């Protein structure tokens, strides 16, 4: 009977497994060029940001090599209440600065993979192997419609379902 219980428990756990893949990152990130403000133009959001408008992620390299991050957005509408979060980024050694651990709450560090970065450091896609969240960000508040479609399709090509994909209005 105990073996049967273990079998059903394992079956239950595997049935609840999160879809996962190995997201490919860019070869290298010049961390100093990556710092600064990024407008979040589209995402598959976490619970905290599901109603975000005017979302901006700002990065500043600390002397110790960690990354001070400020994530600001209006909740619910373009003029909704301002929400601000200050996670801390930690570059994972051996990744050429393309994989970070993003810490909102100690000691948990969420995976943050720079999956796309144009050569001008003006557009980036940050993804996760769990395929649960993704962020399309740019140095400008908008991109032409054809580029938005191109990057949405790129995200889908990484293995993401677009069911919860959402473009973010910027003012």
Model-based region annotation:
Residues 16-171:
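A beta-rich soluble binding module of mature secreted/lumenal proteins
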